[in-house]
Amino acid sequence: YDGPRLADTIPRFHDMGMRYEQLEEALSKDVKNRAAGIKDELDFLFANKERGMVLVEGLKSKKLKEGITHNDTKINNILFDEKTSSPLCVIDLDTVMPGTVLFDTGDLIRTATNTAEEDEKDTSKVQFNFPLFKALIEGYYSEAKGFLSDYEKSLLAESGRNITQIMAVRMITDYLNGDVYYHIDYPEHNIVRARTQIALIKSMDEQWDKVQAFIDGLGK
């Protein structure tokens, strides 16, 4: 993209540092007295805080190129032809703004490779679907290899883990704040969502060696 820089429609949308600041503020206030019941989830997220900074720090250091990203790349934001099922266009463009391409690959991986619903109460059903991940990345890389840098390529899998983590942070923050951002259908909905994201990260981590080996072998 060689045109003028787009405006940030939602400033620092995928800024992991800011999201942790929001979590820490929500935790300090604990307006609904919920923190004591989610110690394990909080411990996990804070233990992974430093790793979660890789994309935002990459942008700041310019190791990652800034481009134009959609920032909400889930399959239900693609409009399909009713008769042929062929994709027609991308929709829901209110979050289009500057970012790293890895924001988009990350959200695509997060939403496409989970074997369960985003709000599955039984986290044993939440698994990272490695065969689907492979097919997804092979298809993506066949089109993206011309513009992805080696560093961006090396972080393709990490991007999925990263965006899953930021969603868990945001969901737990909203839970602590009294469910003021995300629509909920029952009082525990946000913490159920967050637990699903954390379970997906743990499933990714269990398979990480083969995941990263696959990424390292792309295009070779």
What residue ranges belong to the model's regions?
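All-alpha amphipathic helical-bundle segments outside canonical DNA-binding/catalytic cores
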Residues: 148-160
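Structural signal for terminal/edge beta-strands and the immediately following C-terminal loop/tail
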Residues: 196-220
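Active-site activation/catalytic loop segments of kinase-like enzymes and analogous catalytic loops
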Residues: 102-146, 162-181
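Catalytic activation segment of kinase domains across protein kinase-like and atypical kinase folds
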Residues: 62, 76-117
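Conserved helix-loop functional segments at active or binding sites
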Residues: 29, 51-58, 93, 111-114, ...
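Surface-exposed helix-capping loop/turn segments at secondary-structure junctions
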Residues: 1-7, 144-151
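A structural signal for short hydrophobic/aromatic patches embedded in well-ordered alpha helices
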Residues: 45, 136, 155-156
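ATP-dependent phospho-/nucleotidyl transfer catalytic cores
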Residues: 2-70, 75-89, 162, 180-185, ...
